[in-house]
């Protein structure tokens, strides 16, 4: 594979020296960009974008053509795995993701197949290899998957949920069924991420979007334990380089020490944590990624710059920090403000890497 021209993202994840703090944004290829909206219109709908490697490559690269980002992230969706299990993913306008079928009983879960990463999700692997080829070493490519608990909530609820009542009822009423579902999902996610790594992903992130909805005891047993299982099963070196693993639980600020203990390289933080305190709590065990509140991007560029400066100062000197938002960038953000955010990080962080 082509040598990397900019590897500061991978270096920061592995706590190696960098010249400036690297940055990428969750959902950086998304609806806030007019070029993304044009591609989505050409593709017809969201799933056609995901399932066509050329379209997926095109939208993955769009933010990199516009901004000096330090990493690309595969354009896909966390729900590709339940879709490949036969649940029939579709998107309702204004409603978000839905499934034609849901799982509610032990029998439903026993009947679920574990998807073959190459055969059933080959379009994702094709997208990864296409993007790597097109990137030509500009920046590293991040692969990703949803966490077992997060995927399970969509499969049981049939879509997004405000209170996760069906998933939590299953967790407490029928823990055997929930554990079987989570175990199947952990096996599926492990194979899926390893497939992405073999296809060319140079780092991977596990998105535990809904782990923060659980009680502490339930989080440890039904979310964290399965992410640990995945991390233990991942390919950690490929193409002569380490493949760093990032784990991100939104709302996981109470459990940073436990999350830092599962063997991942990097801990993703949402905006409710102070990054300096997080650094003290986890010590040198993991690097940190985050964590500006994405809604700060609706403020003026000077205010964005101030908040970037505050977070950089809170983290302090040295490597081990990848700057990001505390969750995905939202559709109404002005692309110029995203640019101001990225430029501020590179301009203001050099002093911390002398």
Curated annotation (Swiss-Prot):
The record marks 77 as: Transition state stabilizer. Keywords: Cytoplasm, Decarboxylase, Lyase, Porphyrin biosynthesis. It catalyses: uroporphyrinogen III + 4 H(+) = coproporphyrinogen III + 4 CO2. One of its GO terms (biological process) is protoporphyrinogen IX biosynthetic process from glutamate. It is found in: Cytoplasm. It is an enzyme of class 4 (lyase). This is Uroporphyrinogen decarboxylase.
């Amino acid at each position: 594979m082509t040598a990397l021209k900019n590897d500061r993202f991978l270096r920061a994840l592995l706590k190696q020296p960098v010249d400036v703090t690297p940055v990428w944004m969750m959902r950086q290829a998304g609806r806030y960009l007019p070029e993304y909206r044009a591609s989505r219109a050409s593709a017809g709908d969201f799933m056609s974008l995901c399932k066509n490697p050329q379209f997926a490559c095109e939208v993955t690269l769009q933010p990199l053509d516009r901004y000096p980002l330090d990493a690309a992230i595969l354009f896909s969706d966390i729900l590709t795995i339940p879709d490949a299990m036969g649940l029939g993913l579709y998107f309702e306008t204004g409603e978000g993701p839905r499934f034609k079928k849901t799982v509610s009983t032990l029998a439903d879960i026993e009947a679920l197949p574990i998807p073959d990463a190459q055969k059933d999700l080959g379009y994702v692997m094709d997208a990864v290899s296409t993007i790597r080829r097109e990137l030509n070493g500009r920046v590293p490519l991040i692969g990703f998957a949803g966490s077992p608990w997060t995927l399970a909530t969509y499969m049981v609820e049939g879509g997004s949920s405000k209170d996760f009542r069906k998933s939590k009822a299953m967790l407490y009423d029928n823990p055997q069924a929930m554990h079987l579902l989570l175990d199947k999902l952990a096996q599926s996610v492990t194979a899926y991420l390893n497939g992405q790594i073999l296809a060319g992903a140079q780092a991977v992130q596990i998105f535990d979007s809904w782990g923060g909805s659980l009680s502490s005891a339930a989080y440890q047993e039904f979310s964290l334990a399965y992410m640990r299982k995945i991390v233990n099963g991942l390919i950690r070196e490929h193409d002569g380089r380490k493949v760093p693993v990032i784990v991100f639980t939104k709302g996981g600020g109470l459990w940073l020490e436990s999350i830092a203990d599962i063997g991942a390289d990097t801990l993703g933080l949402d905006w409710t944590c102070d990054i300096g305190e997080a650094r003290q709590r986890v010590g040198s065990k993991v690097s940190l990624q985050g964590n500006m509140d994405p809604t700060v991007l609706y403020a003026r560029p000077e205010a964005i710059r101030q908040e970037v400066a505050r977070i950089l100062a809170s983290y302090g000197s040295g490597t081990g920090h990848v700057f990001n938002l505390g969750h995905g960038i939202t559709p109404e953000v002005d692309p110029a403000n995203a640019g101001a955010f990225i430029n501020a990080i590179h301009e203001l962080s050099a002093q911390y890497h002398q």
